[in-house]
Amino acid sequence: MEFSWGSGQESQRLLLSFLLLAIWEAGNSQIHYSIPEEAKHGTFVGRIAQDLGLELTELVPRLFRVASKDRGDLLEVNLQNGILFVNSRIDREELCGRSAECSIHLEVIVDRPLQVFHVEVEVRDINDNPPRFPTTQKNLFIAESRPLDTWFPLEGASDADIGINAVLTYRLSPNDYFSLEKPSNDERVKGLGLVLRKSLDREETPEIILVLTVTDGGKPELTGSVQLLITVLDANDNAPVFDRSLYTVKLPENVPNGTLVVKVNASDLDEGVNGDIMYSFSTDISPNVKYKFHIDPVSGEIIVKGYIDFEECKSYEILIEGIDKGQLPLSGHCKVIVQVEDINDNVPELEFKSLSLPIRENSPVGTVIALISVSDRDTGVNGQVTCSLTSHVPFKLVSTFKNYYSLVLDSALDRETTADYKVVVTARDGGSPSLWATASVSVEVADVNDNAPVFAQPEYTVFVKENNPPGAHIFTVSAMDADAQENALVSYSLVERRVGERLLSSYVSVHAESGKVFALQPLDHEELELLRFQVSARDAGVPALGSNVTLQVFVLDENDNAPTLLEPEAGVSGGIVSRLVSRSVGAGHVVAKVRAVDADSGYNAWLSYELQSSEGNSRSLFRVGLYTGEISTTRILDEADSPRQRLLVLVKDHGDPAMIVTATVLVSLVENGPVPKAPSRVSTSVTHSEASLVDVNVYLIIAICAVSSLLVLTLLLYTALRCSTVPSESVCGPPKPVMVCSSAVGSWSYSQQRRQRVCSGEYPPKTDLMAFSPSLSDSRDREDQLQSAEDSSGKPRQPNPDWRYSASLRAGMHSSVHLEEAGILRAGPGGPDQQWPTVSSATPEPEAGEVSPPVGAGVNSNSWTFKYGPGNPKQSGPGELPDKFIIPGSPAIISIRQEPANNQIDKSDFITFGKKEETKKKKKKKKGNKTQEKKEKGNSTTDNSDQ
């Protein structure tokens, strides 16, 4: 069973195979259609469903479809009617090219059962493509030298159609030079071409244009054409020829590089390389031309490449050669002449020759300093040069001969004003615009010793304290010299002279280089109050010049002298005074008086007295006047008092530090002595006066301090206002000023006339300072002194109502002496410089013309008054010495009386002190005045010798 079953299956398989083979063979039957190319869309091809034996109703159920190996979109089947139609444009040449047969193969497939049918659609050719040449224009290049019958091949046309539509016929447009050679069936190797029938001449006919036409064999005929552009190639049979054989060009000098000079041009009848011309300079041209110019080988432009200078070369001759590029080059020649035009391009040139520098400042006008040469390389007016000089210089230009100028001195020189000049000479030509050049030279002015050293001031005032150390620097003088170098080197020296019995150089010295003035020895105010001398400054020029300056050295006082006790009685020495006093004397009785003087001045000579008890209660028994030195009793003596009293009186000055001397007074009390006739009223008044003296002194000190402060402030302001005043005449002149120092030391008078020299450097020592102290003579002598002072004018002097202070501490100064720097107090005549209060409690109101001295000035305020002459002092004229002046730091008043040269009569104010009494007026003759002056001079000489 199993084998039968197996046999049955194999039988079924065989039957199925035969069935499928039969269907395949039936489907492989082919249907053929034919259509022309370029058929329109929808063109009927065939009833494919009917031809395949298929019903129209079966097409859709059996999925009828058409497939193509080529382009399936060309043909399509309408499933409604079973017709095959053209779906898109069919181009046989595109589809099959130049193939002789062209068909479209379709496969028609149906399902249920599956059947495949082959359909072939033949595409027939139509004459739809004209013959075409590869290009519309064909360029042919034929040399004019080609021989006749030369064959030139041509490329034929092509036709996309086939068959008769592709059979082509050629024809050539008529011409004289070429004919068309057509290929035949037996000459296919040679092909289509042109044959030269006439010789070519490029210069006559450079170009030939022909038209080649082709026609196919279709109906209707289609044609195509190509334009043959035959260019006749040149043969080098013509030489280049220039437009002109000679070119003349004018070229300004100094044109920049690259400037076009001229453009030469040559022509060649040939063309191509045979007509291409290369320009160049001839081989025999000068190197200078090649250096200055350049020619473009293609354009023929000649340009400037070097500096063109008319002064170097006025014209250039250039030979130009033109050569073509033929195989056998031909050449042509021409000449270019370049004429250089002169322009004003050269600045004038200046040169200094024969310089004579430096020039001395004292050179005369007209001195030649330098020789200047000028030149200009230009010609004509461009080369005409004129020179000028800078303004405001003491020089001028003088034209000596052609192209030469002399620089000469036109005015006087002064090196101190201008030490050197920068002289600028300007040379300008006559061109338009003109050119100019400058040359400068520095003219140095050599110095000549024409200026003497000059001091800043004609006179200096110096204040030096006495007892200075030897070699002390007291001042520095400085002089300026406007000259230079050796002429400005200043050396200083003293103007030697004698000061009394000694030389000036023994007192001071001056450093030759620095001008420092040194004191060689300690100066003594008591010996020398004013040292006036001159310092000379001389330069190192030849000859040397010099000038002098005056120095006034005021020696300021220091407290270097202790008070000196006077010995009023003969045989008494050692400062011990013995007195006998009766026990019956009352209070206030003057027992003794201590007398002392101080060689110093001012406060240093202001003495005060103080009682120092040496035993027991002597202090309560006696007292001493603070400034008078009078020792008086303080009470009535009794029996209990010791019969011998030893009193120690301390005499002290007001210096800093103060110096003290001690005086011893031995008082012996005796019985039944004469009773002093001292009125009780006077004693009471004295007692009250002495008691109030201390209180008054306190206020006086306060007032002095206030006035001193105000005085210093006034002095500073006054100095600032008068600092610019130039003295008209020095203090030490030919007249003899007399300095009178007045002082009083109590109810006694001590007179010592001391004459001291004021040393001057300008004149011989003719000035004396007269120092007066209270006289030892009685009141009658003092009266005579007052009378001599009053009688000098011949009439009574009226009192000054504005003067109510001590004349011993008041001074006016109106002089040309410069004392401001040291703070010397100055004022006009009649104007007080310093005022001091007075104490007049113990005295009645003073009479007109009488004032009391200040408390503490060494004057007894109870008994001393001051008297003076009438009227205001005389106004000092220019060159006159002041009546009074005060040295700072010293309260003493120095009164200088200046006597006229022709009249030795003393007419200045004379100050003295005396007890309050009525003054007497007397007149003295001139002879008596002269006799008195001689006596005073003799006393002064004696005093100086004692010192």
UniProtKB/Swiss-Prot annotation:
Disulfide cross-links: 96-102
Glycosylation (residues): 257, 265, 438, 440, 442, 548
Extracellular side: 30-697
Annotated ranges, domain Cadherin: 30-133, 134-242, 243-350, 351-455, 456-565, 573-681
Secretion signal span: 1-29
Annotated GO biological process: homophilic cell adhesion via plasma membrane adhesion molecules
Protein task: Calcium-dependent cell-adhesion protein involved in cells self-recognition and non-self discrimination. Thereby, it is involved in the establishment and maintenance of specific neuronal connections in the brain.
Descriptive protein name: Protocadherin alpha-4
Gene coding for it: Pcdha4
